[in-house]
């Protein structure tokens, strides 16, 4: 894609189209909530970063196949050249994205929201950002701001969760 900025680009990420003289670090769009707001029957986020995440991935693909109508699966696809990390670290970068809650794993099934992976011990956003060269220009204060935005977004998603949703399929958790 040419490593160009999009509405889904994380806050503070370097891209080939990011202005360098006066960078503007807008927050990324919440694609899952946008899609769910359009009444799509099944919306989910997926990533491959650990065995529990693989089980979550499979369950969501299976569920999407069962749902009638339009389904939307937002799959995290790390990009070594664009994100500036070694290719052999792709699974680790995906794991850090999820475990830092920067890329929450969730689903909205016919309007019922559920966080499907809750890290028992979330890693600081700085670990996810530090694994990639595209965030190397950020100051400690900017990283703290991103951490607060990630925390606020997680809290918003947790508040959207439907009562009793954990009874349907328990959220997995990293040990």
Segments predicted by a language model, with ranges:
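Histidine- and/or cysteine-centered catalytic micro-motif in compact active-site loops
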Residues: 48-49, 76-78
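Flexible, low-complexity linker and terminal segments
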Residues: 77-175
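Thiamine diphosphate
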Residues: 1-69, 87
């Amino acid at each position: 894609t040419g490593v160009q900025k999009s509405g889904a680009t994380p806050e503070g990420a370097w891209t080939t189209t990011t202005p360098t003289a006066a960078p503007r670090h807008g927050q990324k769009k919440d694609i899952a909530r946008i899609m769910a707001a359009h009444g799509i029957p099944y919306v989910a986020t997926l990533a491959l970063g650990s065995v529990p995440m693989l089980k979550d991935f499979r369950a969501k693909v299976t569920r999407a196949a069962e749902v009638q109508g339009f389904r939307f699966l937002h799959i995290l696809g790390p990009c070594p050249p664009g994100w500036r990390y070694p290719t052999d670290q792709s699974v680790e970068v995906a794991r850090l994205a999820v475990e830092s809650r920067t890329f929450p794993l969730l689903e909205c099934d016919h309007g019922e929201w559920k966080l499907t992976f809750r890290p028992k011990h979330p890693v600081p956003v700085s670990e996810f950002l530090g694994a990639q060269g595209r965030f190397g220009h950020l100051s400690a204060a900017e990283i703290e701001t991103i951490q607060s935005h990630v925390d606020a977004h997680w809290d918003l998603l947790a508040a959207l969760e439907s009562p009793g949703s954990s009874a349907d399929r328990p959220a997995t958790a990293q040990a």
